[in-house]
């Protein structure tokens, strides 16, 4: 585990302990989840990647990304630009996120939403659903296979999708063994923070049959999108390059081509 992930995991375990003690059991909302993976499948077409557009105020590596930060307005802009799904950062200490951003963004659109959060306890899956999330993120660099399987099983129980994130060959093999059907390849090296799109090109050859492959990080231009589509990616998660634009809708349309 990288230094930054170790730091996040440590404070997240403390945070979850407090939240869990205050609310040990969480009832899911009556509304069924919006199908996250299904929306990506519908949006993907030959020569066109489905887009998971991310609502992210800041990051540890880049600091503040967008000062004019209005989650509902950003969600509507992404939807108008052609995004298939949303990803919303809720972690506060490292990303200046907040749980309220997820509910606010989701209520403004019809798109399925991923809660971009660092999960260290299956309790957080139920919490995510109660906040309106339709999908969760399982970062294999952060959890062992036992915990990953528990997170995925809890998501399935609640009718949610699980995006299983990998960074290298060993993690892709683990994702396959876990039966992941939605796999995200993070092009960012979590130790150096350098981004290399060839990570997706390399790991795509190992993706299990039937899994929907999402490429994440470092996607800025239509040329990047075309390159990643050629290697077998079916969807992309893009945040920073769109969040920095004055006209988010136009930037989203331009990226999708």
UniProtKB/Swiss-Prot annotation:
An MF annotation (GO) of this entry: indole-3-glycerol-phosphate synthase activity
CDD domains associated with the record: IGPS
Record EC number: 4.1.1.48
Pfam families hit by this protein: IGPS (PF00218)
Similarity annotation: Belongs to the TrpC family.
One Gene Ontology biological process: L-tryptophan biosynthetic process
PROSITE patterns: IGPS
UniProt keyword list: Amino-acid biosynthesis, Aromatic amino acid biosynthesis, Decarboxylase, Lyase, Tryptophan biosynthesis
Pathway: Amino-acid biosynthesis; L-tryptophan biosynthesis; L-tryptophan from chorismate: step 4/5
Keyword Lyase attached: yes
Designated gene of the protein: trpC
Reactions catalysed according to its record: 1-(2-carboxyphenylamino)-1-deoxy-D-ribulose 5-phosphate + H(+) = (1S,2R)-1-C-(indol-3-yl)glycerol 3-phosphate + CO2 + H2O
Superkingdom of source: Bacteria
Record-given protein name: Indole-3-glycerol phosphate synthase
